[in-house]
Swiss-Prot record:
<comment type="similarity">
    <text>Belongs to the D-alanine--D-alanine ligase family.</text>
</comment>
<dbReference type="InterPro" id="IPR011761">
    <property type="entry name" value="ATP-grasp"/>
</dbReference>
<keyword id="KW-0133">Cell shape</keyword>
<dbReference type="InterPro" id="IPR005905">
    <property type="entry name" value="D_ala_D_ala"/>
</dbReference>
<feature type="binding site">
    <location>
        <position position="275"/>
    </location>
    <ligand>
        <name>Mg(2+) 2</name>
    </ligand>
</feature>
<feature type="binding site">
    <location>
        <position position="262"/>
    </location>
    <ligand>
        <name>Mg(2+) 1</name>
    </ligand>
</feature>
<dbReference type="GO" id="GO:0009252">
    <property type="term" value="P:peptidoglycan biosynthetic process"/>
</dbReference>
<keyword id="KW-0460">Magnesium</keyword>
<keyword id="KW-0464">Manganese</keyword>
<keyword id="KW-0547">Nucleotide-binding</keyword>
<keyword id="KW-0573">Peptidoglycan synthesis</keyword>
<dbReference type="GO" id="GO:0005524">
    <property type="term" value="F:ATP binding"/>
</dbReference>
<dbReference type="InterPro" id="IPR016185">
    <property type="entry name" value="PreATP-grasp_dom_sf"/>
</dbReference>
<dbReference type="InterPro" id="IPR011095">
    <property type="entry name" value="Dala_Dala_lig_C"/>
</dbReference>
<dbReference type="GO" id="GO:0008360">
    <property type="term" value="P:regulation of cell shape"/>
</dbReference>
<protein>
    <recommendedName>
        <fullName>D-alanine--D-alanine ligase</fullName>
        <ecNumber>6.3.2.4</ecNumber>
    </recommendedName>
</protein>
<keyword id="KW-0963">Cytoplasm</keyword>
Length: 313
């Protein structure tokens, strides 16, 4: 990556913490981002919106923000709208891309309309008859299924359901986190992958092999036995094709600059996109630093490069 004068950035806030279910992940990400930026000579400071009003950013002379918030208002367009209002440049997607990207239900609706392959699904609303909906969904989609709150990240409250009897309880648990729940047909046979996006960098696809049944919160941030395969094992031309498709899945939602697109392959190698992440984790377990490191880009270079994307607007 080309050398960047850290003075170009001015005073930078690293947004971290927040009040979503992913607060601890965000704190971990933010601390590492902060250290990486400071090591590069950037005038960076921590800022937790759960503890201080956003107006303080403008009052204290911040001109730029690295968004290390995860979930909730940090990813759903609210923080982005406030930063736009205060005239502060920020990393990641804008209001529309952030709002759509966090909402798995509406993401899948857009993808369906535009021909991006995504697993068959049904939506369940808080207050529905969970027993009746469970019977309808199993009859339509079969088993196994994944139950996901529409607007939580880091696999918070994601439940794999293998029997029809277990689905109502999974729905009852998921609606505690969101009023809309996505019930998605499980894609089996070809593995789970992610394509990391950071400007024009050509980052490798990563295959994720969790020790447990799927890549849940524990596998993402706690376990040390999750395998991340780089190279991912796909033929070079197939990997290149999937990176192009991942970029399209990201772009059609209005997402910009950097993030991730996660997908599964079935037994025949057909891809099914699950979600995008517009503010990916940046912990020592997280995927973008792993992808960057595989092509010789250090953590410090990555965070400075992501921040540098705010200079292009």
């Amino acid at each position: 990556m080309s050398s960047i004068d850290p003075k170009q950035f001015g005073k930078v806030a690293v947004l971290l913490g927040g009040n979503s279910a992913e607060r601890e992940v965000s704190l971990n990400s933010g601390r590492l981002v902060l250290q990486g930026l400071r090591d590069a000579g950037v005038d960076a400071h921590p800022f937790d919106p759960a503890e201080r009003p956003l107006a303080a950013l403008k009052e204290e002379g911040f001109v730029r923000a690295f968004n290390a918030l995860h979930g909730g208002y940090g990813e759903n367009g609210q923080i982005q709208g406030a930063l736009d209002f205060y005239g502060i440049k920020y990393t990641g997607s804008g209001v529309l891309g952030s709002a759509l990207g966090l909402d798995k239900f509406r993401t899948k609706l857009v993808w369906q309309q535009l021909g991006i392959p995504t697993p068959p699904f049904e939506a369940v609303l808080r207050g529905d008859d969970y027993e009746a909906r469970s019977k309808e969904i199993v009859a339509k989609l079969g088993l196994p299924l994944f139950v996901k709150p529409a607007s939580e990240g880091s696999s918070v409250a994601v439940i794999k359901v293998k029997s029809a009897d277990a689905l109502p309880a999974a729905l009852i648990e998921a609606v505690k986190y969101d009023k809309i729940v996505v019930v998605e047909k499980s894609v089996e046979g070809g593995g789970e992958y992610t394509a990391c996006i950071a400007g024009n960098l050509d980052l490798p696809v990563i295959r994720i092999v969790p020790a447990g049944e799927f890549y849940d919160y524990h596998a993402k941030y706690i376990a040390n036995d999750t395998q991340y395969l780089i190279p991912c094992g796909l033929a070079a031309d197939e990997e290149a094709r999937l990176k192009v498709l991942a970029r399209r899945a990201f772009d059609v939602l209005g997402c910009t600059d950097w993030g991730r697109a996660d997908f599964m392959l079935d037994a025949d190698g057909n891809p099914y996109f699950l979600e995008v992440n517009t503010a990916p984790g940046m912990t020592d377990h997280s995927l973008p630093p792993k992808a960057a490191r595989a092509v010789g880009i250090s953590y410090q270079e990555l965070v400075v490069g992501v921040l540098a994307l705010t200079l292009q607007d």
